[in-house]
Design a protein with these regions (language model features):
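Short secondary-structure junctions
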Residues: 14-19
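Positions that flank functional sites
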Residues: 25
Length: 62
């Protein structure tokens, strides 16, 4: 899964882009605690499986 595909999943769940620091996009949710960080420096390649799992856990989707 590419960073853009992961971003689509996060945005569909209601997360909103908070800020961009270099190649890392950070998202916050109006009701869920914490932040989700997606690294975009890997594009157009797929995200590492462990990185993807971490993103989904941060978002409360896994």
């Amino acid at each position: 899964m590419t960073p853009r595909e992961a971003e689509k999943i996060i945005l569909a769940d209601g997360w909103q882009l908070q800020e961009i620091q270099g190649s890392h996009h950070q998202y916050t949710h109006p009701t869920k605690p914490g932040e989700v960080t997606i690294p975009f420096h890997t594009k157009p390649k797929d995200l590492n499986r462990r990185t993807l799992n971490s993103i989904l856990k941060q978002a409360g989707l896994k």
